[in-house]
Amino acid sequence: MSWISPELIEILLTILKAVVILLVVVTCGAFMSFGERRLLGLFQNRYGPNRVGWGGSLQLVADMIKMFFKEDWIPKFSDRVIFTLAPMIAFTSLLLAFAIVPVSPGWVVADLNIGILFFLMMAGLAVYAVLFAGWSSNNKYSLLGAMRASAQTLSYEVFLGLSLMGVVAQAGSFNMTDIVNSQAHVWNVIPQFFGFITFAIAGVAVCHRHPFDQPEAEQELADGYHIEYSGMKFGLFFVGEYIGIVTISALMVTLFFGGWQGPLLPPFIWFALKTAFFMMMFILIRASLPRPRYDRVMSFGWKICLPLTLINLLVTAAVILWQAQ
């Protein structure tokens, strides 16, 4: 057929790749919620969800059906438009942040030359969703949770971005594929160890995960900025949080652990195994660490993480200049 051109086929293949990758990310985020509950039960010497299906294997399906049929309630005195937009912005921004991650050679949704900057932009956009949710709910606990979340996220995004500048300086590019290719001989985690530590800490904080989950602290704020959400709106926030974990784990692999590179196994398998390891670390951290006070979280970021990232960046720049001479 004359209307089928090579350009059209290329566009269709690109769309197909994007749909497949993003569907896999959403599925991984959903299944991680079930896996986390089972593993937390194991860590805490209890069973966890094991009633629906064999060994609880259909628990996720039951939760999805329950959430889909729950009443989608909107508070009487809330700002209905902003209240509805907030979970959509949160889910979309966190999902789009994964678009620049190459899962194997040639398999990336958007191979941008400003890949890292695009990720930081999407992470910053998620802050607006939190503020919208807290403000539009017209609830004091929701507003306090949103203020905590926005201050914490904006603070730790500074350290998140600075921790990546050493990687960018070594690779000479913001493109994620170029960064993976630059690790053919040595993974960035070795020369950029302190950058990796800071990125991991800031990544946990940006995802609002334990022990940095003060914006959602049940004992203090009754679930924080999404206290008034129910049904599918709450589901978008809930799944979006786990998509954020998948994205941060994938970025750790891509930026510091060679991405898809590895012996014997296919590239995608290596990428999936490395990412699954860091997703498991998120769950282990939640099971083992206590929640510190909010002021100590902020103090830790500005007094320890910020100097560490600046020292790492200065040392990296000095080494690059010394090698160039």
From Swiss-Prot:
This is NADH-quinone oxidoreductase subunit H. The keyword Protease does not apply. The keyword Translocase applies. NDH-1 shuttles electrons from NADH, via FMN and iron-sulfur (Fe-S) centers, to quinones in the respiratory chain. The immediate electron acceptor for the enzyme in this species is believed to be ubiquinone. Couples the redox reaction to proton translocation (for every two electrons transferred, four hydrogen ions are translocated across the cytoplasmic membrane), and thus conserves the redox energy in a proton gradient. This subunit may bind ubiquinone. One of its GO terms (molecular function) is oxidoreductase activity, acting on NAD(P)H, quinone or similar compound as acceptor. Keywords: Cell inner membrane, Cell membrane, Membrane, NAD, Quinone, Translocase, Transmembrane, Transmembrane helix, Ubiquinone. Belongs to the complex I subunit 1 family. It is found in: Cell inner membrane. Pfam families: NADHdh. GO terms for biological process: aerobic respiration. The lineage of its organism: Bacteria, Pseudomonadati, Pseudomonadota, Gammaproteobacteria, Enterobacterales. The gene is nuoH. One of its GO terms (cellular component) is plasma membrane. It is a multi-pass membrane protein. Its EC number is 7.1.1.-. It comes from Shigella flexneri. The chain crosses the membrane at residues 11-31, 81-101, 114-134, 154-174, 186-206, 237-257, 265-285, 304-324. It catalyses: a quinone + NADH + 5 H(+)(in) = a quinol + NAD(+) + 4 H(+)(out). NDH-1 is composed of 13 different subunits. Subunits NuoA, H, J, K, L, M, N constitute the membrane sector of the complex. It is an enzyme of class 7 (translocase).
